[in-house]
Amino acid sequence: MLHGTEVLKKGFAKMTKGGVIMDVVNAEQAAIAEDSGAVAVMALEKVPADIRASGGVARMADPNKVQEIMDAVSIPVMAKVRIGHFVEAQVLEALGVDMIDESEVLTPADERFHIDKKKFTVPFVCGARNLGEALRRIDEGAAMIRTKGEPGTGNIVEAVRHMRIMMSEIREIQNKEEEELWEVSRKIEAPLELVRETAKLGKLPVVNFAAGGVATPADAALMMQLGADGVFVGSGIFKSDNPEGYARAIVEATAHYDDPEVIAEVSRGLGTAMRGLEISEIPEEGRMQDRGW
């Protein structure tokens, strides 16, 4: 896959627009994702639900694991690195992954700085809860943004919150005067140039996916109707009773997000979705969405 300039990196991200990107931990799961119509897979050692359950320090996947998944599919392969861990990113770039996720799902490596993504030829995706976080990551070189949600919970409420906040903040700046945009830039700690561009476009200058808590076809369609350009599914597929069925159904629901009849049809007889977590049950220090700044 050709990467390099900012235009090429953003162009690759746009190629996934309207699709579903699935977390996978082995070649078998990667094949299920590809057969279901996923536009890409995310290679990692454990899905977020298992990372949450096992505790400890979560790191980049073993290069052998990433290579195994890359060899198993023809669709693009992404992989996660810890926030601020630019050497993990260098390793993944050397392996030839198609995109890197600087992810709050893994244990942050740097409490002050995110990775300078402009130094890499491979594109990056980063999570955000609001417009300020999104524009700061884009300023660092992110080619794609996704909601953080609360990973590994099967609970869509935080992803909905983050998407609504971001879309509301974008609408608020669209009709502001230049001096007001200066004020917004200072308030959200984001570059004025990106604030201006977002106000003019009426959307982020890069694709904006939903992630964190998507567990059903209806969840995926909900996020698309709220303005997402596509959907990441972490634990929702392979923690369900019927991974193949849920994978296909979520792809269909994402593609036909504005057609309730299609969503109803693909949702029939899927079996039990992953067991979800109530957000209030998660202690503050255990909330992955709060990682990063």
UniProtKB/Swiss-Prot annotation:
Binding locations of D-glyceraldehyde 3-phosphate: R164
Active site per UniProt: K80 (schiff-base intermediate with d-ribose 5-phosphate)
One of the GO BP terms on file: amino acid metabolic process
Domain of life, source organism: Archaea
Chain sites annotated for binding D-ribose 5-phosphate: D23, G152, G213, G234, S235
Keyword Lyase applies: yes
Keywords (A to Z) from UniProt: Lyase, Pyridoxal phosphate, Schiff base
Class of the enzyme per the UniProt entry, highest EC level: lyase
Enzyme Commission no: 4.3.3.6
UniProt pathway annotation: Cofactor biosynthesis; pyridoxal 5'-phosphate biosynthesis
Any one GO molecular-function label of the UniProt entry: pyridoxal 5'-phosphate synthase (glutamine hydrolysing) activity
Catalytic activity, as annotated: aldehydo-D-ribose 5-phosphate + D-glyceraldehyde 3-phosphate + L-glutamine = pyridoxal 5'-phosphate + L-glutamate + phosphate + 3 H2O + H(+)
Protein's UniProt keywords contain Cell membrane: no
Entries under CDD domains matching the protein: pdxS
Stated family: Belongs to the PdxS/SNZ family.
Self-association state and partner proteins as the record states: In the presence of PdxT, forms a dodecamer of heterodimers.
Described purpose of this protein according to its UniProt entry: Catalyzes the formation of pyridoxal 5'-phosphate from ribose 5-phosphate (RBP), glyceraldehyde 3-phosphate (G3P) and ammonia. The ammonia is provided by the PdxT subunit. Can also use ribulose 5-phosphate and dihydroxyacetone phosphate as substrates, resulting from enzyme-catalyzed isomerization of RBP and G3P, respectively.
Protein known as: Pyridoxal 5'-phosphate synthase subunit PdxS
Organism: Methanothermobacter thermautotrophicus (strain ATCC 29096 / DSM 1053 / JCM 10044 / NBRC 100330 / Delta H)
Lineage of producing organism: Archaea, Methanobacteriati, Methanobacteriota, Methanomada group, Methanobacteria
